[in-house]
């Protein structure tokens, strides 16, 4: 099938990355359609909606490069699959990653299904990742060429069938080249700042936002030996390894969050960046998704990331039970956070990932939840 007979539907956010993605595909001769996904009502307290501005940018870019465009509303799907999950995780005292769930349930499920109804052969997004296609039909996901921008961490839940329908045109180039192309083509988004943070919070204060949906209950802040240090504003506002926002004065090393007791509503803190309570030796993770087959029965060595832009850590992975894996670290790792993703790699190939449930010391002692 020639490029002109291949329809690619591009998820366009109104940012420079998806704009250049659409431009590249159009230049390569594909039949390109731009889709703006409205996942959240971004209207602020003054009645201003950032989604309107973003969609106007999508319209401008699509008109510039000469492709049709549509807006599709996925607010219900986003609420049901992403935001409800986000709140449920915080209720459990965990720190979720809504971007991972958004990619799994919205951008590469609801959006992909919609695109296929439009006759799409592929969907494309402005993610910094790569897809390697093999002659037998199976695919692999690779890190983006720009190590500083690689987004495979957030794509770890994508399946073989999803990836077989996906294109990442800017995964082979660096961010500065994306900007250069946008400026060279005088695209409307060429100078637009990259968006940061969680889309449904935007520029708002995180505590204020979360308190609108979940009641906060203040409680005691204690050391692991039981000494009362202060008062916390609500366990959901804190994450393992957090230093800022604790409100603890005094001399000596800074204080860090080292654990939570949900039953008694206690936040545990200790002094020192390298306090032993912040380190663990292995984790158990569920919601497992592997792009390709791996040998969980015998276990295998690979590297892992436990948060975005973290250096790879050498690990050994094996089955814990039919619903979970055990990831054992070659050396203790600091501040691994339940609710976040553990993402596994073999060189540049992203093998897949899972959601961190519990974190342990070598002795089998549970870390972080006392």
Curated annotation (Swiss-Prot):
* Domain of life where this protein originates: Bacteria
Task: Provide the disulphide bond pattern.
Answer: 102-199
Residues annotated as binding ATP are: 11-18, 37, 126
Instruction: Return the EC number.
Output: 2.8.1.13
| GO process terms (BP) | tRNA wobble position uridine thiolation
Cite the active-site annotation. Answer: 102, 199
Catalyzed chemical reaction(s): S-sulfanyl-L-cysteinyl-[protein] + uridine(34) in tRNA + AH2 + ATP = 2-thiouridine(34) in tRNA + L-cysteinyl-[protein] + A + AMP + diphosphate + H(+)
Job description of the protein: Catalyzes the 2-thiolation of uridine at the wobble position (U34) of tRNA, leading to the formation of s(2)U34.
Which family does the record claim for this protein? Belongs to the MnmA/TRMU family.
Q: What protein name applies here?
A: tRNA-specific 2-thiouridylase MnmA
Q: Which organism is it from?
A: Staphylococcus saprophyticus subsp. saprophyticus (strain ATCC 15305 / DSM 20229 / NCIMB 8711 / NCTC 7292 / S-41)
